[in-house]
Structure formats: structure tokens, C-alpha cells
Amino acid sequence: MGFQKIDYATWPRRPYFEHYHRDVPCWYSMTVDVDITALLPRLRGSGLRFYPSVIHGISRMVNADPALRMAMDETGAIGVYDRVDPTYTIFHKDDETFSVLWTAYQPDLRAFCQDWEADRARYGDIHTFEARPPEAGQGLFNISAVPWASFRSLHLELPEANDYLLPIFTLGRYRKENGRTLLPLAMQVHHGVTDGFHVGRFFNRLQAWADSAPEMGA
């Protein structure tokens, strides 16, 4: 998995990064209700599961934007991953804990969901935090799910994570409202590399995908 270092001296975003990383360290979050009214019947007709399909949709939009693939390597250099893969949580009902797995991102939805099913079968019953540890040099971003609550806002406190630049997502329980089905999705980003413009573009792209999702069929 490639990691392309930026030329920090000529990077147009350098003053913004230095302000929000060094002078005023700043993470911020935004929670948006994604309208999945059209998505759900398409999923039912396709035979695909909801959770891996939404993980794929989020991953597609993250990989579409270099600003959402930015990270710092072990030397502190800033760069952009050629591809980032999603980690996601699997809940264990027996002891009420969870494990973190990952599945390699690929553009094809059905192929991704097949890989997700295989990873879930292989690692999903391992009761430890990282049931599938990351590979060396791998770019990973986080998705978690809280299917027991439909929240309006969610923010994570990350006091020691100022060098972590990749986005973090949390899914809530979807709900019916005024005839629509809405999925709360919280997105937390580092302001050093991600502005409101990038967050807005992500959600607009994700909504367009949820409205059409042509790869699922009619």
C-alpha cells in the first residue's frame, strides 16, 4: 500500500496544518442523517447485508478524496495513502465486548461484501480488541456502530491523538421520520487536514450513493 509524502515546504495547506496541529490542536465532529429510504429496498433485493454495504459506501467516499487519506508516518512526515482500508467493530453478545476487524477496500461492492463475510467468519469470534491486527504500512480508518441508539450528535475525546489525521466514523440506529428512513452518521476529523468543505463533500457524495447505488441493481 503506497504512501506518498508531500513536499512540506511548498504544501499550500501548511499554514492551516500548523495552526490546527501545533498552535490550536483541533478535532471536530459533524453528525448528519443520511437518508437511506431508497437504499434499504435495493439492499433487500440484492441480498447484500446492510452493515458491510454501508462500510463499503463510506470507504468509497473516503478513498475518493485525498484529504481523507492523509496521515503521518512513523517519522512524522505527512503524506497521502494510495488506498485506505476500513476497520469496523463486531459486537460479542456473550460478554458484551467488541473486536476490531478490517477488510481490504476494493471498488466492487459485491466482492467487498464477500471478503467482509470471509473476514467476519475467520476473525469475528476472536475475543480480543484487535481480532485482525493491521499489516505493516497499512492505512486504516475507523468505523464503529452503535445500533442500539439513534443519536443526534456524537463526539469523541482524543487528548493524545493529535498526530492521527484519518477520519473516524460512528453509525447509529436508523429511524423513521416523516416517511423517510434516516441513518445517523457521525464523522470526526482533524482540522489540520480536513475542513468543513471536505466533510460536506463527503456527505453529499455518500447521500448520492445512497440515493442511487446502481451496483445493487434496480
Each PLM stretch: what is its role?
Residues G2-I6, H21-S53, L68-P86, S99, ...:
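Gly/Ser/Thr-rich phosphate-binding loops and adjoining beta-strand/alpha-helix segments
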Residues E157-Q188, G192, N204:
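Intrinsically disordered, low-complexity linker/assembly segments
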Residues T10-R14, R60-M61, D65-R83, T87-V100, ...:
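Catalytic/RNA-binding core of pseudouridine synthases
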Residues L39-A64, L183-F202:
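Acyl activation and transfer enzymes in specialized metabolism, enriched
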Residues H92-A149:
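Helical lid/core segments from catalytic subdomains that handle acyl or acyl-like groups
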Residues D119-A131, E135, L165, F169, ...:
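Plant-skewed but cross-kingdom recognition/interaction modules and surfaces
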Residues R152:
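Active-site cores that bind ATP or allylic diphosphates and position pyrophosphate for catalysis
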Residues A208-A218:
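Flexible helix-coil linker/hinge segments at domain or subdomain boundaries
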